[in-house]
Amino acid sequence: MMIVTTDRIDGYNVKAVKGYVKGSTVQTKHIGRDITAGLKGLVGGEIKGYSEMMDEARKLAIHRMAQDAEAKGANAVIGFRLQTSTVMANAAEIIAYGTAVEVEKE
């Protein structure tokens, strides 16, 4: 599955547009990460637990979007975007979205 942020893929023609696709996940913090975050807030620096959590969440959202695209018969996603929002205290949603297309080499 090719996933690009552009509206086209060099060397390929769009054969068919399959439609909007998305994948999302909601991740929450746990007490261990909150304690570490509190300590890092005092001394500064990266909060690795949160960075790892968000990286895993992005990968999962992208994977779910790719599954949605495959279910629609696509072999690529163009116009790919990621968005994050807070859905409640200590919980964030990551959504990956784009346009599913079927492409073929020129």
Swiss-Prot record:
Matching HAMAP family: UPF0145 (MF_00338)
Naturally occurring in which organism (per UniProt): Halalkalibacterium halodurans (strain ATCC BAA-125 / DSM 18197 / FERM 7344 / JCM 9153 / C-125)
Family classification: Belongs to the UPF0145 family.
InterPro entries: UPF0145_dom_sf (IPR035439), UPF0145_YbjQ-like (IPR002765)
Protein name (record): UPF0145 protein BH0643
Taxonomic lineage: Bacteria, Bacillati, Bacillota, Bacilli, Bacillales
